[in-house]
């Protein structure tokens, strides 16, 4: 199993949710986040003064999936979130040793 951590632009949230749903993902954790990287920060001018934010707003999804589904999910997310410009985001792929559904005690793929 894998844990996919997706970092995307807030404007792509609904498209990514639809892509995950179309890929058979029944649930995800979605967190508002901010970060910095190649995109740098944003600057705005207010009453003649420039204000600079060092971070950019992002949305983070966490999704558990079976190993065999990883490639198709990544491709669907890249198609949904990608613009080809700096700041599109990242996908982190982590080995997931186990999952436990609290309500039933199911483990592994059955708990996803």
Q: What is each of the regions a protein language model found here?
A:
Residues 1-112:
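Positively charged, small/polar-rich N-terminal and surface patches that mediate targeting and assembly
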């Amino acid at each position: 199993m894998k844990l996919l951590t997706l970092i995307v632009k807030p404007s792509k949230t609904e498209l990514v949710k639809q892509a995950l749903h179309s890929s058979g993902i029944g649930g995800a954790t979605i967190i508002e986040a901010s970060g910095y990287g190649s995109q740098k920060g944003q600057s705005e001018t207010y009453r003649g003064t420039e204000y600079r934010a060092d971070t950019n707003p992002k949305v983070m999804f966490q999704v558990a999936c079976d190993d065999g589904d990883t490639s198709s999910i990544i491709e669907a997310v890249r198609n949904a979130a990608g613009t080809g410009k700096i700041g599109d985001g990242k996908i982190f792929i982590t080995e997931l040793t186990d999952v436990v559904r609290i309500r039933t005690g199911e483990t592994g793929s059955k708990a996803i």
